Amino acid sequence: MINTKVTLAGVELKNPVMTASGTFGSGAEYSEFVDLNKLGGVVTKGVANVPWPGNPTPRVTETASGMLNAIGLQNPGIDLFCRRDIPFLKQYDTKIIVNVCGKSTEDYCEVVEKLADEPVDLLEINVSCPNVKEGGIAFGQNPHALEAITKEVKKYAKQPIIMKLSPNVTDITEMARAAEAGGADILSLINTLTGMKIDIYRKTFALANKTGGMSGPAVKPVAVRMVYQVTQAVKLPIIGMGGIATAEDALEFIMAGATAVSVGTANFFNPYATTEIVDGLAKFMEQQKVEDINQLIGIVK
């Protein structure tokens, strides 16, 4: 009997496969295609203290082996989220991870405080989205600001805290150490890489926001490299993401040192990606005669 269970800061997941924030709604949108009970966890779309309208359109465009998005963290706000989305997810046997966004330290803390007594398992703090003009980018790209906001958020949190790191920095390990120093329980990486696309026929930017976050298969080698670097630099468990579309992709991250993985852009071109990866991991373990998936974590030194 193979064991696919992994543990993140004392929270046990039935397997290491989760959704990535912003690509799976809050689960309801995919529940017709995906048996949410099969997933290790569902990471919700980012939620703020008040509703956000998001950026003007166009907000999404395709790139070679990927996409650019500048959604702007459109969300219904924490109050509606708690009334509508958490009760829906509680119907399923999967861990609930709420992604939190904000434009100031106070915004983040307000959301975290409201979630303190809700039946959610982990909180992922989004300090790295590159398409919001205020707030997040400054926290995610400055180690002092990142350490400070981690400390503040921890004061209000009852659940373990995941700090989601931006790849748009000179040294990802410096940011990882800053989050660790601030008291983070878990790190997740990478968020999207900042990119741009020009519409040569309209002679303007493809996105109304000019820049957007690049994701999809094209970013995977960068993400695997950064996950490996971070696992060598800190003692925290890591959730790896960035271009994961198959079990083989997920295994690269796990072997590089990630305890769990998040599947994002793949959900758009293959709604069944997450459960296919769950099955693919089990199949690989059986073929390779690996009894416990934890034996594969960080096997590449």
Positions of the model-derived regions?
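N-terminal capping/small domains of soluble enzymes
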Residues: 1-96, 102
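C-terminal helical cap(s) of enzyme catalytic domains, especially alpha/beta-barrels
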Residues: 54-64, 198-212, 254, 266-291
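Short gly/pro/ser/thr-enriched loop/turn and capping motifs at secondary-structure boundaries
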Residues: 48-53, 130-132, 194-197, 268-270
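Short, surface-exposed connector motifs at secondary-structure boundaries
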Residues: 11-14, 91-96, 156-161, 232-236, ...
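Alpha/beta enzyme core
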Residues: 32, 103-239, 245-256
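Structural signal for hydrophobic packing residues in well-ordered secondary-structure cores
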Residues: 93, 116-119, 157, 281-289
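A short, charged, Gly/Pro-tolerant segment at domain boundaries
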Residues: 294-301
